[in-house]
């Protein structure tokens, strides 16, 4: 053991007399100078045997210098620090001399043990410090009198280490007694916890830096302990590189400097000296960077950046030479909170052809929090990879959009000679996921090739998985085999002693070759579609990982070994690859007592897969993927429909199943094995070998049930093992405590776990996966103790402070626990940790450190079985967790989404047995392929059939509620961020660009604004449909000559393919990004991504990327050439969007050449008629889940050809099916088809009306009252032009009841009119139906007051000559004007476009320039821009779930608060809330447009067919399925387009199939209800027969659909949970239907095929249920009619109270009240808020009150996503007693303040007061308060 004096920094030996030299005479063959006289020694001389000092023999007597031995590090390979030492990234350091440091004896040096001490000089240089690092077994240093650092090299001998640990423990006990607290910074070792009474686990991977929050937690804990007693000391224990100790010492030095005192100055100096002398030379750049972050945040020199950053490019300047001929093959792995979120393709860079390489991430990858970016080099021929560089940073400290790291800033690379000295790495960020303009120069040269085969196991191999579950088995016996597939192999390895070195080798060391790996790509969702994890490859994972050096042959196993492996693998569902699924489950359930269970940290690589084929009971195979309107729902993205799951830090399950962490060697494991555990896909979950506890001789080691990353993301904590197992193990959570105080600690396993708060997921896949894992958790935790949460650890610490004995685990035996290492942080936690970090920096006062970390703590030990530790806060918000509502069978209660567990009343928490995981859902895992079984580890179910996962919830002590930190995570919002006017471009942070980005900005900004033009169209996210609002009313401005049209196109061939094989997959070879196709217009500013494409949080994407001057980088290279033949139908359609604006100013052209304007090429005639059958491509209305490629507004008119071309369909379906698009006022351009002038106007039937709309929702300008309301759009003949059919809005007909809610203003266009939404081209100029041309066409735009002109031309009068298109929008038209100037720009020049915008049209402002101003009360500020101060009806309408958009319908799920005396302007009746049985519900809206109702006339097909590249029957056109391009994320362009094959000619399809599918389509008006909410669907179905169903647009997962269906019996879990209330609601189950490149399918069902359309899906499931609980029963009548027949009058007070009401308000602040409530609490909170400096920034939130409680939704995601306060926690609600007002930052009248007081989550005494200010004058604070009081009163009466 080495001791060092800190006062002089000298070793004890250095204080002794100088040592004399031991000279010997030597003949020098090489010239060497004499050390004394400096003359050359020519022949003989003397040299010292010890220090090699040389001199002449005559000079020997003059030698005075002491003999100093050389530093040992000189003999150690310089590469030893390069790679993580704990056997991570095996093969990464192979070319550097090996990954693990070799023992010093191997290099010929002498190992220095405590008994052999070298004489070292003072530590002043790197060599000496390296000597310290490498030479001694154990280094114990008193950094200060009260801080002791104990460090041990990772390569040291284990026996010596154990003995040294014992010596240290004895020394500490003898010297400090019980007054020392040990902080373990490395892997947990059982012997450490045995030897020391007080241990806190804060481990993180070696050579890495800890999370910023963890640094805060450590400092706070140290300070608390040291301040508790002057005799207390802190011991920092570390095994590995001493950089970990350095980070803590430096951080604490800065931390203690906050409250600097003179008596601590010496301590701080000692810490500084220790850090600089001993740590800096051996530390990593990232560690120094984090110390700098911490110091800067504490001092205020670094301001918190709360904005999320989207990473678009990683540019490596200078090509490292990792290949023999130069060059390298890099690929990136990006981790957020140590969770993999992205894997790039492999770039092959020749050594001499490039000076830099750009790795482009499309769409931009959302990064927030602690980020680790690791760049690997994939070796060319060997299955190995090296680390090129590694860099860690935290986004809170990144303020520039261009960040450059030099070589000296890059871990690993900073001392790697292969990385050029001038090399640097540049990161290009933006504030949105869209491609950045102006970055064309970053495109790599032709010599750079990219391999997107990221399913290569070597690429998927994650380096950090094992760290979270690994322990360094200090004193335990070496397990006789690896505990599971440690390195990604399919089989575990039975370890045997190596005869040479005594190390443990492995039998069956090799894994199956790659070719032998079963390809489960069919069952894995594309990584790119969900989280941008990989690039184009949909093959996400494979099973095997080649071991470097392993032979290719698979060694045979003895029968005993096979049995052992089978037993081991039974927990994984692997069973050596050939056994069936039944065997897996039975294996698991009949597992012997000591057998292995599914490891909890193993992963389900089948992403979001829940279902199995065959034998399960129908009622137990339900997906139940709840998709919307849940209070705690996914924050930013949803589903794999092109979402950026990375927004939530979600890890694709195929990406990494658990927090990546460095995995140290299991004791005795052969050091040559790669220990980067493979996270392999292919449907096999893997468990890291070193994860299990000790095993006894007779059985395999205990392994915890399988676990996936999503579970960690969902905030679940990992479970301990079964109590019957030999040794319970604990794990840790990387970021569970949002406050960041104790985000990575470990606890005794058995202490009761409190229910984690619901966490926002990243995607629907994550949602499913969370449920998948929760199934196991429920099983595990019914039988396993849980690790206590952080807060308990905090209390543990305080109990130590109080000198209480450390609480023993509640398990029956002592628990040497596994290290609790970083669990993946959920995105919510990451966000909250950043926000909390900000607050922490303001709140970290060491003087008060002894106080509890959190203001709100529950009384420890208050519940049965509770440990003395207080509860851990689960969330920074005051949300309540939801009760366990899902069983293993995969059921999820209606109303709850996997992605977004709905908070439940606190009382429900108490029913959770403490041994169970508190997961929002218990879910059935699907393992390994399509025939997956559910692995239930419930002992009681062992005798059950394999497919009957039953739940047995053992009774147990009630779970204590979780304590909530008093910190309300509130990002510091500037007033401008809180402004309620989204039409204003938010001010962006200064663009501090560096590197390649900087020089692009000025030019682009200058280019974007030209003198006589409106401001550049700054794109803003329109949350309603994923668009970006263009704030320029001019589409024809020079900078945007063409406007992209997000029209989705489906080739007829493709449609036929899909129709012929409804359950199959379209053979679509190239699914390129259509969004890019439309963005790549020359000179076009990307005006709007296609609807429901990019799912970026609305509040995040407001930075105009055009301001960066960055041009999209389109991998598909789909440039739409403005001239020449279009290369594809997509391109031609895209040109159509451009043709309008360009033609606007051009002279009218005859219809004889329509294609020149519409498609850019001649459209061949079919059936002889050109004009009549021509339709310009028009998207569907956004209300429809599909975009129409043929402009028929999804069949706004009958799809049949006109009378002169073929039989016509009846006109009635026009309303029932044709009007599904909601094209009420006008059909699509194709409506100009040859409909005879005598064609009767379709009558408005009660086919379907949105329940979400009622008259109250829509108001318009006062003058609209006086005008006649239009009822339907008609096609008629205009006098004077008998041959031209005209479509006008009937302005003189009285409003039909069905349209009353929309028909407010005759000058409003049809609601959600698809044709208006993207293309206003009603046809080329002069589009006579028989070829007649219209001369002198004019374009006139009549605008109502408050509505900006839709056209460039002055507003004119209606003209009745030539061809007229009276384009009008109604308030419900969210899609009008989806492009800048779309209203006028896309109208062909030859049309009279009487474009009229109603003042209240929510979407007119969407892209019509900056003239729009958002009206207060707009539920989604990003979504609507109202004009002229008129608030849109949607603004008054209470709620829009976040997907109010994908459909374009802003489906309001709840009515506004009743304001009795006040009626809405312009309406004659009081506001009434719609309900399923109300008239508005039945008739209020036209029949929705079925997504696949895309009907093309022959002219359409004639025009489109030639544009498809049809090769061998494979259509290279887009698969119009609404899925994103392979790269996922924001490149999703046409989220809703599904092919309609009912009208396509199908040469080889069966007429029966076609007829039946058409039948399903024809009934779609009964079962496709896009606008209804979940509650309305339940109300419609709960009284129906089993099999009844409704498909609606998902309001949570944009672009997806929700399938609600009635089942015969509720899931078992629901029954067991004794849920109060009407169980009939539980009979309606909810599933998510996702859209993808290959069509639609049930989300998370491996045995579900892709269908080309919803109709095909419905038809197939009506024949065979597949993964559904039962077959679908296709309805023959509208359920809304039945609902009307069976129910009384709607909108009664009781209904309103039950359904709830909502509106938008300003969220002002949340203030802790301790136990105060009542008016005093509101008064106090108001006073504190108004007195605060700075005053809190108000944020617009959606305030919903229902019988369940109060739900707040921050639609802009500025502050939070959703917070739910169960009604039983709300104790008071009222106005401010002093009637103070809130002054709005944007001006306007002061608003009344009101608030409610609610108990904090997990607390029975502490309250928080949440303050709000009224926003909408039509929803006064008094009305809200009254309604809340009524709801509370009503709930009290029921109780």
Swiss-Prot record:
Region (Disordered) residue spans: 85-116, 502-563, 689-708, 716-796, 852-1159, 1174-1270, 1277-1296, 1309-1348, 1366-1510
Positions where Phosphotyrosine occurs in the chain: 491, 1028
Record field: compositional bias (Basic and acidic residues): 1065-1078
Domain Phosphatase tensin-type residues, every copy: 129-301
Superkingdom classification of source: Eukaryota
Compositionally biased tracts (Polar residues): 97-116, 502-518, 525-538, 1027-1039, 1189-1214, 1223-1268, 1330-1347, 1440-1457
Residue ranges of domain SH2 in the record: 1567-1676
Enzyme class label: hydrolase
Location(s), subcellular: Cell surface; Cell junction, Focal adhesion; Cytoplasm, Cytoskeleton
Main location as per UniProt: other
Enzyme Commission numbers on file: 3.1.3.-
Compositional bias (Low complexity): 867-881, 937-951, 1176-1188, 1468-1480
Processing after translation: Extensively phosphorylated on serine and threonine residues in a p38 MAPK-dependent manner which reduces interaction with DLC1 and increases interaction with tyrosine-phosphorylated proteins including BCAR1/p130cas and PTK2/FAK. The majority of the phosphorylated Ser/Thr residues are immediately adjacent to a proline residue. Also phosphorylated on tyrosine residues.
Modified positions (Phosphoserine) in chain numbering: 463, 489, 503, 558, 746, 826, 889, 894, 919, 1024, 1032, 1088, 1092, 1228, 1281, 1296, 1373, 1398, 1413, 1418, 1485, 1497, 1504, 1550, 1692
Annotated tissue distribution: In the lung, detected in the alveolar septa (at protein level). Ubiquitous.
GO terms of biological process kind: cell-substrate junction assembly; fibroblast migration
Metal-binding in keyword set: yes
UniProt-annotated glycosylation sites, renumbered to this chain: 1156, 1271
Domain C2 tensin-type: 306-432
Pro residues composition-biased segments: 952-963
Pfam families, per database record: C1_1, PTB, PTEN_C2, SH2
Entry-annotated residues carrying Phosphothreonine: 504, 985, 1293, 1370
Induction (UniProt): By transforming growth factor beta (TGFB) which is dependent on signaling through the transforming growth factor receptor TGFBR1 but is independent of SMAD signaling. ROCK activation, actin polymerization and MRTFA/MLK1 activation are required for TNS1 inducibility by TGFB.
Assigned protein family: Belongs to the PTEN phosphatase protein family.
Chain's role: May act as a protein phosphatase and/or a lipid phosphatase. Involved in fibrillar adhesion formation. Essential for myofibroblast differentiation and myofibroblast-mediated extracellular matrix deposition. Enhances RHOA activation in the presence of DLC1. Plays a role in cell polarization and migration. May be involved in cartilage development and in linking signal transduction pathways to the cytoskeleton.
Name the record gives this protein: Tensin-1
Species per Swiss-Prot/TrEMBL record: Homo sapiens (Human)
């Amino acid at each position: 053991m080495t001791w060092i004096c800190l006062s002089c920094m000298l070793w004890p030996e250095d204080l002794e007399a100088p040592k004399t030299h031991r000279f010997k005479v030597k003949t020098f063959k090489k010239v060497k100078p004499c050390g004394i006289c400096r003359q050359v020694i020519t022949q003989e001389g003397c040299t010292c045997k010890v220090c090699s000092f040389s001199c002449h023999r005559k000079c020997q007597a003059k030698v005075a210098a002491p003999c100093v031995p050389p530093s040992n590090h000189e003999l150690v390979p310089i590469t030893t620090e390069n790679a993580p030492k704990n056997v991570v990234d095996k093969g990464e350091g192979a070319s550097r001399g090996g990954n693990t440091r070799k023992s010093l004896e191997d290099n010929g040096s002498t190992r220095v043990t405590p008994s052999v001490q070298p004489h070292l000089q003072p530590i002043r240089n790197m060599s000496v410090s390296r000597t310290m690092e490498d030479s001694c077994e154990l280094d114990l240093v008193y950094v200060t009198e009260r801080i002791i650092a104990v460090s041990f090299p990772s390569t040291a001998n284990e026996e010596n280490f154990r003995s040294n640990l014992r010596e240290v423990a004895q020394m500490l006990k003898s010297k400090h007694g019980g007054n020392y607290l040990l902080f373990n910074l490395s892997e947990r070792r059982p012997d450490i916890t045995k030897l020391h009474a007080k241990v806190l686990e804060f481990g993180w991977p070696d050579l890495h830096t800890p999370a910023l929050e963890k640094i805060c937690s450590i400092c706070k804990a140290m300070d608390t302990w040291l301040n508790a007693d002057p005799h207390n000391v802190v011991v920092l224990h570390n095994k590995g590189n001493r950089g970990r100790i350095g980070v803590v010492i430096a951080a604490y030095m800065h931390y203690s400097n906050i409250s600097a005192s003179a008596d601590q100055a010496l301590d701080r100096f000692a810490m500084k000296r220790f850090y600089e002398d001993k740590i800096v030379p051996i530390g990593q750049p990232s560690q120094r960077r984090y110390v700098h972050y911490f110091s800067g945040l504490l001092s205020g020199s670094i301001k918190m950046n709360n904005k999320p950053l989207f990473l678009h490019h990683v540019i490596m300047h200078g090509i490292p030479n990792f290949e023999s001929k130069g060059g390298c093959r890099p690929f990136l792995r990006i981790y957020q909170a140590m969770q993999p979120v992205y894997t790039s393709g492999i770039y092959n860079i020749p050594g001499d052809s490039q000076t830099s390489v750009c790795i482009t991430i499309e769409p931009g990858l959302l990064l927030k929090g602690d980020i680790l970016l690791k760049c690997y080099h994939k070796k060319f021929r060997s299955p190995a990879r090296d680390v090129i560089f590694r860099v860690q940073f935290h986004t809170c400290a990144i303020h520039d959009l261009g960040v450059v790291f030099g070589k000296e800033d890059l871990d690993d690379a900073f001392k790697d000679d292969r990385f050029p000295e001038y090399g640097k790495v540049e990161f290009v960020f933006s504030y949105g996921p869209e491609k950045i303009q102006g970055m064309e120069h970053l495109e790599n040269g032709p010599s750079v090739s990219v391999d997107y085969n990221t399913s290569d196991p070597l690429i998927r191999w994650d380096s950090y998985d094992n760290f979270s579950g690994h322990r360094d088995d200090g004193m335990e016996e070496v397990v006789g085999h690896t505990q599971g597939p440690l390195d990604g192999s399919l089989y575990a390895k039975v370890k045997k002693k190596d005869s040479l070195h005594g190390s443990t080798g492995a039998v069956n060391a090799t894994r199956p070759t790659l070719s032998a790996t079963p390809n489960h790509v069919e069952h894995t969702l594309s990584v790119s579609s969900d989280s941008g994890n990989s690039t184009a490859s949909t093959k996400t994972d494979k099973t095997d990982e080649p071991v470097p050096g392993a032979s290719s042959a698979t060694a045979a196993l003895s029968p005993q070994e096979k049995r052992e492996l089978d037993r081991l693998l039974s927990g994984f569902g692997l069973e050596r690859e050939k056994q069936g699924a039944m065997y897996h489950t039975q294996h698991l359930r009949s597992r012997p007592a000591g057998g292995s269970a599914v490891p909890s940290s193993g992963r389900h690589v089948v992403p979001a897969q829940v279902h199995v084929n065959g034998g399960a009971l129908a009622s137990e195979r339900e997906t139940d993927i709840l998709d919307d309107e849940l209070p705690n729902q996914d924050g930013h993205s949803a589903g794999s429909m092109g979402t950026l799951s990375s927004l939530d830090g979600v890890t694709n399950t195929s990406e990494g199943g658990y927090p990546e962490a460095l995995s140290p060697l299991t004791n005795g494991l052969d050091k040559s094995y790669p220990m980067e555990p493979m996270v392999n896909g292919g449907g096999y979950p893997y468990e890291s070998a070193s994860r299990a506890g000790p095993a006894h001789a007779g059985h395999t080691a205990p392994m915890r049930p399988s676990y996936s990353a999503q579970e960690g993301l969902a905030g679940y904590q990992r479970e301990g093992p079964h109590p019957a197992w030999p040794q319970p193990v604990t794990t840790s959570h990387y970021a569970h405590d949002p406050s960041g105080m104790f985000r990575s600690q470990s606890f005794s396993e058995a202490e009761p776990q409190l229910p984690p708060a619901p966490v926002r997921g990243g995607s629907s896949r994550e949602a499913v996966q969370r449920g998948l894992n929760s199934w196991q958790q429920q099983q595990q935790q019914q039988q396993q103790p849980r690790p206590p949460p952080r807060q308990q650890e905090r209390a543990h610490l305080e109990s130590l402070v109080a000198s209480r004995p450390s609480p023993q685990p509640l398990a029956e035996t002592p628990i040497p626990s596994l290290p609790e290492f970083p669990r993946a942080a959920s995105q919510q936690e990451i966000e909250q940790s950043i926000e909390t970090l900000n607050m922490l920096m303001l709140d970290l006062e060491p003087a008060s450190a002894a106080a509890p970390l959190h203001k709100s703590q529950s009384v420890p030990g208050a519940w049965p079985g509770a440990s003395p530790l207080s509860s851990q806060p689960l969330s920074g918000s005051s949300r309540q967790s939801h009760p366990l509502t899902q069983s293993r069978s995969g059921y999820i209660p209606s109303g709850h989404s996997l992605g977004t567990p709905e908070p439940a009343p606190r009382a429900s928490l108490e029913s959770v047995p403490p041994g169970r995981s508190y997961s929002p859902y218990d879910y059935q895992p699907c393992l390994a392929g399509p025939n997956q079984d559910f692995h239930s580890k419930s002992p009681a179910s062992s005798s059950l059939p394999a497919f009957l996962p039953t739940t047995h919830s053992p009774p147990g002590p009630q779970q204590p509620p979780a304590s909530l930190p008093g910190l309300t995570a509130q990002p510091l919002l500037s007033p401008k961020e809180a402004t309620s006017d989204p039409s204003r471009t938010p001010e962006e942070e200064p663009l501090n660009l560096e590197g390649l980005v900087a020089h692009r900005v000025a030019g682009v900004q200058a280019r974007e604004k030209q003198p006589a033009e409106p401001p550049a169209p700054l794109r803003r996210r329109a949350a309603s449909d994923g668009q970006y609002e263009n704030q320029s009313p001019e589409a024809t401005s020079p900078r945007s000559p063409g406007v992209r049209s997000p029209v989705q196109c489906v080739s007829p061939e493709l449609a036929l393919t899909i129709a012929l094989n409804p359950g199959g997959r379209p053979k679509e070879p190239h699914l390129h990004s259509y969004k890019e196709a439309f963005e790549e217009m020359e000179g076009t500013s990307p005006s709007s991504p296609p609807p429901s494409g990019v799912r970026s949080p609305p509040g995040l994407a407001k930075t105009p990327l055009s301001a960066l001057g960055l041009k999209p980088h389109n991998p598909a290279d789909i440039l739409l050439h403005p001239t020449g033949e279009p290369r594809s139908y997509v391109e031609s359609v895209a040109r159509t969007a451009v043709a309008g604006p360009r033609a606007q100013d051009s002279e009218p052209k005859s219809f004889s050449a329509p294609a020149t304007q519409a498609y850019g090429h001649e459209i061949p005639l079919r059936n002889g008629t050109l004009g009549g059958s021509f339709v310009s491509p028009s998207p569907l209305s956004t209300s429809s889940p599909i975009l129409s490629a043929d402009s028929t507004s999804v069949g706004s008119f009958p799809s049949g050809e006109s009378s002169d071309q073929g039989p016509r369909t009846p006109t009635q379906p026009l309303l029932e099916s044709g009007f599904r698009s909601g094209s009420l006022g006008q059909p699509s351009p194709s409506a100009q088809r040859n409909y005879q002038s005598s064609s009767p106007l379709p009558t408005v039937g009660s086919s379907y009306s949105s329940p979400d709309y009622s008259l109250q929702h829509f108001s318009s300008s006062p003058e609209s009252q006086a005008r006649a309301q239009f009822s339907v759009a008609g096609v008629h003949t205009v006098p004077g032009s008998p041959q031209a059919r005209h479509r006008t809005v009937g302005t003189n007909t009285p409003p039909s009841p069905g349209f009353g809610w929309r028909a407010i203003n005759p000058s409003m266009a049809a609601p959600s009119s698809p044709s208006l939404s993207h293309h206003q081209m009603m046809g080329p100029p002069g589009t006579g139906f028989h070829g007649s041309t219209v001369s002198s066409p004019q374009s006139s735009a009549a605008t109502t007051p408050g509505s900006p002109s839709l056209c460039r031309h002055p507003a004119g009068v209606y003209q009745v000559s030539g061809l007229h298109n009276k384009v009008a929008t109604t308030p419900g038209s969210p899609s009008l004007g989806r492009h800048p100037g779309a209203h006028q720009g896309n109208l062909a020049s030859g049309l009279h476009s009487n474009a009229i915008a109603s003042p209240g049209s929510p979407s007119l402002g969407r892209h019509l320039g900056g003239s729009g101003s958002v009206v207060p009360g707009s539920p989604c500020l990003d979504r609507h821009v109202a004009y002229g101060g008129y608030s849109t009806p949607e603004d008054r309408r209470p709620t829009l779930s976040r997907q109010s958009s994908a459909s374009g319908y802003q489906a309001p799920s709840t009515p506004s608060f009743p304001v009795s005396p006040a009626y809405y302007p312009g309406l004659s009746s009081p506001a009434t809330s719609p309900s399923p049985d109300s008239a508005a519900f039945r008739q209020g809206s036209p029949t929705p447009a079925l997504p696949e109702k895309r009907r093309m006339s022959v002219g359409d097909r004639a025009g489109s067919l030639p544009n498809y590249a049809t090769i061998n029957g494979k259509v290279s056109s887009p698969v119009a399925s609404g899925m994103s391009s392979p790269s996922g994320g924001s490149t999703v362009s046409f989220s809703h387009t599904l092919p309609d094959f009912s009208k396509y000619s199908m040469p080889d399809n069966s007429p029966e199939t076609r007829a039946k599918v058409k039948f399903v389509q024809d009934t779609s008006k009964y079962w496709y209800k896009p606008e209804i909410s979940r509650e309305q669907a339940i109300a419609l179905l709960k009284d129906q027969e089993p099999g009844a169903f409704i498909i609606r647009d998902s309001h949570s997962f944009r672009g997806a659909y929700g399938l609600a269906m009635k089942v015969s019996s509720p899931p078992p879990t629901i029954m067991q949970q004794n849920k109060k209330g009407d169980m009939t609601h539980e009979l309606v189950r909810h599933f998510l239907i996702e859209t993808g490149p290959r069509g639609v399918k049930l989300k998370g069902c491996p045995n579900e095929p892709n269908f080309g359309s919803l109709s095909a899906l419905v038809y197939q499931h009506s024949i065979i249920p597949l993964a559904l609980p039962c077959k679908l029963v296709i309805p023959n009548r509208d359920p809304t009619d039945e609902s009307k027949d069976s129910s009384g009058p709607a909108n009664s007070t009781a209904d309103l109270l039950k359904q709830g009401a909502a509106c938008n308000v300003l969220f002002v602040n949340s203030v802790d009240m301790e136990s105060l409530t009542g008016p005093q609490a509101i008064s106090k909170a108001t006073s504190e808020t108004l007195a605060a400096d700075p005053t809190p920034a108000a944020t617009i939130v959606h305030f919903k009150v229902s019988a369940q409680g109060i739900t707040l939704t921050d639609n802009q995601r500025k502050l939070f996503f959703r917070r739910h306060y169960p009604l039983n926690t709300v104790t008071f609600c009222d106005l401010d007693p002093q009637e103070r007002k809130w002054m709005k930052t944007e001006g306007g009248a002061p608003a009344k303040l009101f608030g409610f007081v609610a108990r904090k989550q997990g607390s029975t005494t502490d309250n928080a007061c949440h303050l709000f200010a009224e926003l909408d004058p039509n929803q006064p604070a008094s009305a809200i308060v009254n309604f809340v009081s009524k709801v509370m009163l009503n709930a009290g009466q029921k109780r």
